[in-house]
UniProtKB/Swiss-Prot annotation:
The lineage of its organism: Bacteria, Pseudomonadati, Pseudomonadota, Gammaproteobacteria, Pseudomonadales. Keywords: Cytoplasm, Lipopolysaccharide biosynthesis, Nucleotidyltransferase, Transferase. This is 3-deoxy-manno-octulosonate cytidylyltransferase. Pathway: Nucleotide-sugar biosynthesis; CMP-3-deoxy-D-manno-octulosonate biosynthesis; CMP-3-deoxy-D-manno-octulosonate from 3-deoxy-D-manno-octulosonate and CTP: step 1/1; Bacterial outer membrane biogenesis; lipopolysaccharide biosynthesis. It comes from Pseudomonas syringae pv. tomato (strain ATCC BAA-871 / DC3000). GO terms for cellular component: cytosol.
């Protein structure tokens, strides 16, 4: 049985790379609605959209979602979730799953999986998911975050760079994946306990987080363990660019 949890979908209008992204239409619906519909198919007790923009609030109310207006000065989606946890009055041990607002194809099964993994691993302050990288272009793509873990499935680091660097193999060729190196792509879904979210905000960003623009590095920087498992069902990839949007449109509008 999956532990009780709440899904929060952070949705920013003012993305520096792709402004207005949550309201871009796919198959006649705003993208954030598709994410919400997928989250509603999970075992979550509650699904809430969190945004700093009145246009997104209006759109979400139009399709029947619970939506909260948050401050517009948060450093990351996790900082925004901490405000939501306070607004909802969640207990410190309540599990919150952060489903990115640009993942319209997120499988409901992985939402349940990441919540269950956190519940099963009290040594971890966060849980997240990954999948194997089988394409050398993905290894060198900075929009695809790489994750390395220890023997217990706990994250060692996350990076946009091709880590670990296979020194000898990549010196010979960068046109094929090095053999016997288990490269993994991080899937941007997180589970946390509500109490941890408040700690996360109190620490503030660290230089490593700012350098890579990866909020999970703040947790590692402060000694928090992050559990990483291979996703039961890998999502086909989120929408980071207009090209990604067209790819998802082709999948859903075919």
């Amino acid at each position: 049985m999956t532990a009780a949890f709440t899904v929060v979908i952070p949705a920013r209008y003012g993305s520096s790379r792709f402004p207005g992204k949550p309201l871009k239409t796919i198959a006649g619906k705003p993208m954030v609605q598709l994410v919400w519909e997928q989250a509603r198919k999970s075992s979550a007790e509650r699904v809430v959209i969190a945004t700093d923009d009145a246009r997104i609030v209006e759109a979400c109310r139009a399709f029947g979602a619970e939506v909260l207006l948050t401050r517009d000065d948060h450093n990351s989606g996790t900082d925004r979730l901490a405000e939501v946890a306070t607004q909802l009055g969640l207990a410190a041990n309540a599990i919150v799953v952060n489903v990115q607002g640009d993942e319209p194809l997120i499988p409901p099964a992985v939402i349940d999986q990441v919540a269950a993994n956190l519940a099963k691993h009290p040594e971890a302050g966060m849980a997240t998911l990954a999948e194997p990288i089988d394409d050398v272009a993905a290894l060198f793509n900075p929009n695809i975050v790489k994750v390395s873990t220890d023997i217990n499935g706990l994250a060692l680091t996350f990076s946009r760079a091709p880590l670990p660097w296979a020194r000898d193999a990549l010196a010979r060729s960068k046109d094929e994946l090095p053999a016997d190196v288990p490269y993994r792509r991080h899937i941007g879904i997180y589970a946390y306990r509500a109490g941890f979210l408040h700690d996360f905000v109190s620490w503030g960003p660290c230089w490593l987080e700012n350098t890579e623009s990866l909020e999970q590095l703040r947790a590692l920087w402060n000694g928090v363990r992050i559990h990483v498992a291979d996703a039961l069902e890998a999502p086909p990839g989120g929408v980071d660019t207009p090209e990604d949007l067209e790819r998802v449109r082709r999948l859903l509008e075919a």
